Amino acid sequence: MKFAYRFSNLLGTVYRCGNLNFTHDGNSVISPVGNRVTVFDLKNNRSNTLPLATKYNIKCVGLSPDGRLAIIVDEGGAALLVSLVCRSVLHHFHFKGSVHSVSFSPDGRKFVVTKGNIAQMYHAPGKKREFNAFVLDKTYFGPYDETTCIDWTDDSKCFVVGSKDMSTWVFGAERWDNLIYYALSGHKDAIVACFFESNSLDLYSLSQDGALCVWQCDTPPEGLRLKAPRGWKADILQREKEEEEEDEEEGDRETTIRGKTTPAEQERVGKVKYSRLAKYFLNKEGDFNNLTSAAYHKKTHLLVTGFASGIFHLHELPEFNLIHSLSISDQRVASVAINSSGDWIAFGCSGMGQLLVWEWQSESYVLKQQGHFNSMVALAYSPDGQYIVTGGDDGKVKVWNTLSGFCFVTLTEHSSGVTGVTFTTTGHVIVTSSLDGTVRAFDLHRYRNFRTFTSPRPTQFSCVAVDSSGEIVSAGAQDSFEIFVWSMQTGRLLDVLSGHEGPVSGLCFNPMKSILASASWDKTVRLWDMFDSWRTKETLTLTSDALAVTFRPDGAELAVATLNSQITFWDPENAVQVGSIEGRHDLKTGRKELDKITAKHSAKGKAFTTLCYSADGQSILAGGMSKFVCLYHVREQILVKRFELSCNLSLDAMEEFLNRRKMTEFGNLALIDQDAGEENGVAVPLPGVRKGDMSSRHFKPEIRVTSLRFSPTGRCWAATSTEGLLIFSLDAQMLFDPFELDTSVTPGRIREALRQREFTRAILMAFRLNEKKLAQEALEAVPQNEIEVVSTSLPELYVVKVLEFLAASFEESRHLEFYLIWTQKLLMSHGQRLKSRAGQLLPVVQFLQKGLQRHLDDVSKLCDWNRFNIQYVLAVSKQRGMKRTLEPVDTEEDSDASDEDSLHLLRAAGEEEEEEMLI
């Protein structure tokens, strides 16, 4: 088994905080999600998270005009220069202060950041290699409060900065003689956004109270004059002074009097001036809805404003005509962005974690995604690995597509937190348990709740399990310590299993036998036999409270996680412990800012809360109250690899040691409400509160892993944590893993064998080298009529390798029919021999089925659409042939005559029929 799993995607969370951006082509949205960045491709319906992370939550993102570079700045002021082409970090930089916004100039040569009450302009990184990618050019002073927003003119000559001191400042990017800086006032609240008009120095400024000021400049952009160098200026001033002295002498001779302007008046002559043309108010009279975000499209003169109540307005400027107004959420609209064409508008709501893309002309949603409001608790893979279902504390159940990364259905029938989710073996039914006292079954075809299982007395269910046939549903209670068993077909309660003396923490059915394993806080694991009237077959005594239980895929082994950070392995047939793992030191828990004790002592109360076997059963994943997920080898009982889910220091319990400089005699400085001016201040959680309303919105949520699952294909695994749903997968492109390699296997010899038409030898050498491009070249070089001969000559060991390659190629390659022929010939030739190793080949077969099923769905939809269109066209063409031509309008006499003629014809036809009948 390979262990080179790497982070591949982040699901379950679509937006946290920061500003949204559209890419250069306008088809993708770049959204900051915690300390990561996700790119939503709206054209191809895919989402992908960049393989990079900052130390804190991302605060602002700036894109270069060509869309190739991005500057990502977190809350601590650390910046990353990222290439969106190769998806890698090019440079690290620290601004040594909190940055509110960053913006590139339209020509891409410079960028400006607003930090504190100043604005700093840097030279943008070029295409050549440089020792320092960020070179400071100028620092602009003026505002006395924090600066909030930036906008550039189209020619990159000037930029405008808004501030919390209710003023707007226009600065020159170059040393202009008639514009150094210009301060504009007239607002009664902090500036939220400011925008230049297209090809003009006219600008708009918006404040938090919903006021819009229109400013007109008396100078066009071409009227800006460069300031002369100091040497030239001194010569010019000296020349002017000499001319003035000569004029004075001539005046004395001719007794004429000439007036002089003061130096202040001379300074004002020829300078840029602004005047306020109009002032509009976005709020109605008596409405105190705060403006939170705004965006302006210069080509179409479209202004989009978002408010704290979840409402957004569309106005046409400068006439301020209202185009549209809509409420999209109950929470504040934190960010607004418009794409390059001006058709799509992106909205981000940080409170609910919503990301919306609205097409304002057709008044329809292009994208509408929302994560779980509270933390996710449980997850499950579908049998084919295509879908992931998650349940959260907000009572919602969401189904995610692993290929696109989007949630395509949200089930909201539960009225309280979801505690467990699972798929049936068919993959068409989802079963969930909740604290509202119900277990529900959902149909994935119609997205409806077709079964609701309840207990005779109201109880809170903590876990759920379904047997391999999909007919038996069981759920454990955390208050009555009982296990309830229902029938899926009838919905009737079959039995109530009693015996546990503590809350039931986990349930799991044996995949091969009719045995149910239940773990409880009473330090026991009970095995119940379904065919023996649900009697207790065995009781496994543990040394501590059981927190999780799971069976190996072949059902021959049982793993239990306990409160003392141990994982014990049992033989379910003989009820004998076969191994144990001590994982206390592998968890590496951190210290929370509220903890009075060190991380070393608090680790005694931390343990693994979720377990999952790999697809082949050789390894097991374990996660719990830590930022790490541990991968153990079951037989050797050793730690193989430890995966760090997050490095986000905005979460609590991330560090093992706290900064002693923050520990004062009054307590930890982190608990002092320092950000009261931002929104609602810092909410400190109540003692003992781990989840719920206070936990989801307090300043630093605690990092923890709530659920782990391996994909049935074995290529990836998923984890639900405070950060969201993270997927780790095997990246074949980054891994060189040869198979039975020797010195005779080289790319040159592989291509030489292909030229000599020795296809079998070339394929064997290509898979021994295990290079994807060489394997693809070797397989695609085989003529279609020789595939059957080559496939029969392959050894059985290499057949599995070829099937794995074909399964991966179905997700990328366009040669669908060619690879289908390869798959068919391999399975027909080696199917009987592969059947003897069905257990080991199950991940490969499921991986193959996943790719084939996706192509089947796509092709079937396209074929159905074409077939229905052809049927419609044929039906319309037949109806057109049946239509009669329009008759000319006749006079009354002609119409009477035609009526009489028709009557005569009818009578004549009737007489002929009577004669025929008589004959």
Curated annotation (Swiss-Prot):
Residue positions, PTM Phosphothreonine: 891
WD repeat copies, ranges: 12-50, 53-93, 94-132, 142-181, 186-225, 286-325, 328-368, 371-410, 413-452, 456-498, 499-538, 541-580, 603-642, 700-740
KW Cytoplasm (keyword) present: no
Region (Disordered): 238-266, 885-919
Protein family (similarity comment): Belongs to the WD repeat PWP2 family.
PANTHER family per the UniProt record, alphabetical: PERIODIC TRYPTOPHAN PROTEIN 2 HOMOLOG, WD40 REPEAT PROTEIN
Role of this protein: Part of the small subunit (SSU) processome, first precursor of the small eukaryotic ribosomal subunit. During the assembly of the SSU processome in the nucleolus, many ribosome biogenesis factors, an RNA chaperone and ribosomal proteins associate with the nascent pre-rRNA and work in concert to generate RNA folding, modifications, rearrangements and cleavage as well as targeted degradation of pre-ribosomal RNA by the RNA exosome.
SUBUNIT field: Part of the small subunit (SSU) processome, composed of more than 70 proteins and the RNA chaperone small nucleolar RNA (snoRNA) U3.
Protein name as annotated: Periodic tryptophan protein 2 homolog
